């Protein structure tokens, strides 16, 4: 990845596979999407949003908010893992039977 940050001044344009760059960009987009969904979901659930608390009174999270964020994050990743495993199993089963995409 040093070519992205100018670490290697050799002529890298010819040696960089555009398909790999496209896959890396797509992966970064997916990771960013997961992160944004996690932040939005857990913030909405855990950070008090009553009219009196729309402005953050404290610079840090309250203890209850912090615990909620920790639990929400753990649950989010656990569900994400289980969904990924289930989708992988479904894809493998469909591929084995030849019914993928039908």
Curated annotation (Swiss-Prot):
Cell compartment(s), UniProt: Mitochondrion inner membrane
Biological processes, Gene Ontology terms: protein insertion into mitochondrial inner membrane
Self-association state and partner proteins as the record states: Heterohexamer; composed of 3 copies of TIM9 and 3 copies of TIM10, named soluble 70 kDa complex. Associates directly with the TIM22 complex, whose core is composed of TIM22 and TIM54. Interacts with the transmembrane regions of multi-pass transmembrane proteins in transit.
Protein name, per record: Mitochondrial import inner membrane translocase subunit TIM10
GO cellular component: mitochondrial inner membrane
Entries under InterPro entries matching the protein: Tim10-like (IPR004217), Tim10-like_dom_sf (IPR035427)
Membrane topology: Peripheral membrane protein
Cysteine pairings via disulfide bonds: 42-72, 46-68
Location of the motif Twin CX3C motif: 42-72
Main location: mitochondrion
GO MF term list: metal ion binding
PANTHER family: MITOCHONDRIAL IMPORT INNER MEMBRANE TRANSLOCASE SUBUNIT TIM10
Any matching Pfam family: zf-Tim10_DDP
Job description of the protein: Mitochondrial intermembrane chaperone that participates in the import and insertion of multi-pass transmembrane proteins into the mitochondrial inner membrane. Also required for the transfer of beta-barrel precursors from the TOM complex to the sorting and assembly machinery (SAM complex) of the outer membrane. Acts as a chaperone-like protein that protects the hydrophobic precursors from aggregation and guide them through the mitochondrial intermembrane space.
Superkingdom, taxonomy of origin: Eukaryota
Keyword terms, alphabetized: Chaperone, Disulfide bond, Membrane, Metal-binding, Mitochondrion, Mitochondrion inner membrane, Protein transport, Translocation, Transport, Zinc
Record remark: domains: The twin CX3C motif contains 4 conserved Cys residues that form 2 disulfide bonds in the mitochondrial intermembrane space. However, during the transit of TIM10 from cytoplasm into mitochondrion, the Cys residues probably coordinate zinc, thereby preventing folding and allowing its transfer across mitochondrial outer membrane.
Family stated for the protein in its record: Belongs to the small Tim family.
């Amino acid at each position: 990845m040093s070519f992205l940050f100018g670490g290697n001044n050799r002529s890298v344009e010819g040696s960089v596979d555009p398909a790999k760059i496209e896959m890396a960009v797509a992966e970064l987009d997916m990771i960013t999407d997961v992160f944004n969904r996690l932040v939005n979901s857990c913030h909405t659930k855990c950070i008090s949003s009553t009219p009196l608390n729309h402005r953050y009174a404290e610079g840090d999270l309250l203890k209850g908010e912090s615990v909620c964020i920790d639990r929400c994050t753990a649950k989010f990743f656990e569900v994400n893992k289980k969904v990924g495993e289930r989708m992988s199993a479904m894809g493998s089963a469909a591929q084995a039977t030849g019914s993928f995409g039908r």
